[in-house]
Amino acid sequence: MKPIIPPQNLSELLERANMMAGISLAQIAAHRGITVPKDLKRDKGWVGQLIEMELGATAGSKPEQDFLHLGVELKTIPIDSKGKPLETTYVCVAPLTNIEGLTWQDSLVCHKLQRVLWVPVEGERHIPVGDRRVGTPILWEPDLQEQRLLQQDWEEIMELIALGKVEKLTARHGEVLQLRPKAANSKALTQSIAEDGSLKMTNPRGFYLKTAFTAMLLNKVFG
């Protein structure tokens, strides 16, 4: 199986993404010689990885945009029959130490969300994984209001992390952006700032976009 050459420009990326619209995951997987899992319980990232592969994304799990040379992040988004997002969208790992002087403009969240190619995919559990179809892609850049909301949430969350209050942050914090434990294994630990300024061990955290925010983005395009 030959790796797909990354798209040379934005129009080539969008052309590839648009060509997938209406196609089932089984068709894409067969074309790439990949076995479709029975369900996604143990393969939660399978859909995203398949779409990344088909579009020629280069970043993998590196902390940079999927199409760094185009300044584009790729996000697959599972939707229901009404086009509503079924789950929050993972953005990146949250830094829990060495954050003094870190600004929104320099943050990985800001960098990743400057320009996103959203690829909706049918995600309702009653549809077999292989039968789920890819939807029409959306190239999105946050407008001033969306940037403001994201920045505001990020700054409030980072302030609480800096004050050693990471354990007090719940998924309810933030209007559009939330912080949640990242590891599937709750025994995974990393360092974070304690309230007295020392370091303590805690579960890794990740930034996620709330479904109300992604629903609003999809609604702006599809109504």
UniProtKB/Swiss-Prot annotation:
Subcellular location(s) per record: Cytoplasm
GO MF, one example: endonuclease activity
UniProt key word Cell inner membrane: no
Protein known as: DNA mismatch repair protein MutH
Single Gene Ontology BP annotation: DNA modification
CC per GO annotation: cytoplasm
Gene: mutH
Lineage: Bacteria, Pseudomonadati, Pseudomonadota, Gammaproteobacteria, Alteromonadales
One Pfam short name: MutH
Reported function: Sequence-specific endonuclease that cleaves unmethylated GATC sequences. It is involved in DNA mismatch repair.
Membrane-crossing segments per the record: none
Family, as annotated: Belongs to the MutH family.
UniProt keyword annotation of Cell membrane present: no
Alphabetized SUPFAM superfamilies for the sequence: Restriction endonuclease-like (SSF52980)
Main subcellular location: cytoplasm
Organism: Shewanella sp. (strain MR-4)
Keywords attached to this entry: Cytoplasm, DNA damage, DNA repair, Endonuclease, Hydrolase, Nuclease
